[in-house]
């Protein structure tokens, strides 16, 4: 099976609307991301509905807690059968290691475990506001290195950091990049953005794209256009 690069961010507050959108696209063309709002509103059964339709799911809940609590949440995600789950790297090495170790019994069926470095909406002034006197890129490198040393599969990072992280941490370390906007799209609330082709060329492995697809008149066509552009690289 082709390793789909595009992860469509489902940001709906109505389950019927979300499923109506999902039914317009092909599981062979993308994966789906379910975040905090949808999971809180609709719960695990919504993820199961997506699985029934043949989609792989990135459960984007950014767990951040004491090691025992965080690892049990990660295990619950594995039991749900998701393809990818994430934790905040700022939770530290013990938390991330516990989360990785609890997945070992699942073998090849375990989800990818990804660390969250610096949220793409954050600028240097935001980091200063929480007591971190560092540039976003410096903090990303620090947390990504900690994530790799903890044995996780990769990190969420902006496309601007992808090239640097690939060079620093190796080709096998997966980079999941939000803030992706096909050419001509509005910037939205992501501060550090890039086009799909640019992001893959920079070293990103998976691209999270939301409104440019979910709000398109013909989302299947937009997906095809993006995938075609990536295939022609």
Swiss-Prot record:
Pathway: Pyrimidine metabolism; UMP biosynthesis via de novo pathway; UMP from orotate: step 2/2. The keyword Ion transport does not apply. It holds the Pfam family OMPdecase. Keywords: Decarboxylase, Lyase, Pyrimidine biosynthesis. One of its GO terms (biological process) is 'de novo' pyrimidine nucleobase biosynthetic process. The keyword Magnesium does not apply. One of its GO terms (cellular component) is cytosol. Transmembrane segments: none annotated. It catalyses: orotidine 5'-phosphate + H(+) = UMP + CO2. Gene3D superfamilies: Aldolase class I (3.20.20.70). The active site is at residue 62. GO terms for molecular function: orotidine-5'-phosphate decarboxylase activity. It comes from the Bacteria. Its EC number is 4.1.1.23. Substrate binds at residues 11, 33, 60-69, 120, 181, 190, 210-211. It is an enzyme of class 4 (lyase). Disulfide bonds: none annotated. SMART domains: OMPdecase. InterPro entries: Aldolase_TIM, OMPdecase, OMPdecase_AS, OMPdecase_bac, OMPdeCOase_dom, RibuloseP-bd_barrel. Catalyzes the decarboxylation of orotidine 5'-monophosphate (OMP) to uridine 5'-monophosphate (UMP). Homodimer. PANTHER family: OROTIDINE 5'-PHOSPHATE DECARBOXYLASE (PTHR32119:SF2). Belongs to the OMP decarboxylase family. Type 1 subfamily. NCBIfam families: PRK00230.1 (NF001273), pyrF (TIGR01740). This is Orotidine 5'-phosphate decarboxylase.
